[in-house]
Amino acid sequence: MRTMSRYGITRIQESRVEVPARPPPVQEAICRGPKSPCRFPFSILFSTFLYCGEAASALYMARVYQKNNDFYWMTYTIVFFLVASIMDQLTLIFVHRDLAKDKPLLLFMHLILMGPLIRCLEALIKYFEVWQKAEEEEPYVSLTRKKMFLNGQEVLLEWEVGHSVRALTMHRNAYKRMTQIQAFLGSVPQLTYQLYVSLVSPEIPLGRVLLIAFALVSVTYGATLCNMLAIQIKYDDYKVPFHAPEIICVTIWRSLEITSRLIILVLFAATLRLKALPFFLINFVIILLEPWVRFWKSGAQMPNNIEKNFSRVGTLVVLISITVLYSAINFSCWPAMQLRLADRDLVEKTQNWSHMALHYTLRLLENIAMVLVFRFLGTRVLMNYCHTFICVQLIVAYLISITFMLLFYQYLHPLRSLFSHNLADYLHCVCCPWSSRVRSENAESTPETQLNRGVV
């Protein structure tokens, strides 16, 4: 039946079901929230504690190695400590943009590798100043708008940010990046090396135990923080809440993943000694060059939005540093995001399930191959222990970490409602492509779909 609507549009009706027209878009309402609260900088204090603890234990072990005439072990212990410490100082200076400011005392503290301590004192002093002036009205310097889910509904929140809160936020952001560099450029090599020394050395002093403990906590904390930063970067328009179950799940996942991976690397290196070095170098170089090869194939130009005062050489140095950090993370665990040098944001903001599946598949095959080498060739390593039992334990620990990863992304991700397809859909599509195709065909043949096709 052909009818004429009040807008003058001819409509063909094949049934008596009336299809309502889509309402015009409504302007999104903005909810004014309270002023941004000033929270105690626990994360800054904890990062400084890990930095000082790892530095003190590394210097102590270097002194012990020197007394025992183990100059080879002493050299590597100091090198791993110095590389991470220097990168930490440069990160804090870069984020706070201190080179353009007249702060000679602060730069001197960074020069003697004490920058995190003085920055922590600055953050604590700023917090207590704000706490004492809590009753006073502080003029805000900016307005922040973020989307958030309240009672299942997406709302846009707007709140004022004062100068003191903004300064503390800058301190937190700087320490988050410093923690990543400390964890993966310092703690991972230090932890791997000290585990190797413990494996080939007849005794384990208390100082080495403390150094291993600090490095392990630093790596686990850095990997957990890596997940949170990845979520915040991917969903920059949203205020992301993190609760205790999510943090506990990510911590268990990351601790099992990194611990099993590093122990497997140590056993593999202890089995093959210098013959294992080409495998490690080739693996790391492939991870390091992969983003640049993709950037070269895309034909894109070098991004110029990293820092407005940087030249092309400065931008290139920053991109190389980011790539080295990304490769170090990727070598020991999943980096939680994919580096895209051709994009403006330098990372891929979409949820790429294929990248995650490919990473864990390759790492699982690598780990299995390395434990098999240890099982059949490591006759002189851990002679008083059952090699088969150790291999099974390590592979099971890695599989358990993957299980916690699946649990997090399927049920505990703070913004899982924004996923167009969740993890279960991806696994169902990969494992059962025929049933997925049948399900999509059935969805296309529903009465609602046929009715919409019949409307002109």
Swiss-Prot record:
The record describes its membrane topology as: Multi-pass membrane protein
Major location, coarse class? membrane
User: Where is the protein found, in the record's own terms?
Assistant: Membrane
Q: Does the keyword Transmembrane apply?
A: yes
Q: Matching Pfam families, A to Z?
A: XK-related
Cellular component per GO?
plasma membrane
Q: What is the top-level taxon of the source organism?
A: Eukaryota
Segments crossing the lipid bilayer: 40-60, 75-95, 105-125, 209-229, 276-293, 316-336, 356-378, 389-409
Q: Which cysteines are joined by disulfide bonds?
A: none
* Keyword terms: Membrane, Transmembrane, Transmembrane helix
Query: What PANTHER family does the record point to?
Result: MEMBRANE TRANSPORT PROTEIN XK FAMILY MEMBER, XK-RELATED PROTEIN 2
Provide the family line.
Answer: Belongs to the XK family.
In Swiss-Prot or TrEMBL terms, this protein is called XK-related protein 2
Task: Name the gene for this chain.
Answer: XKRX
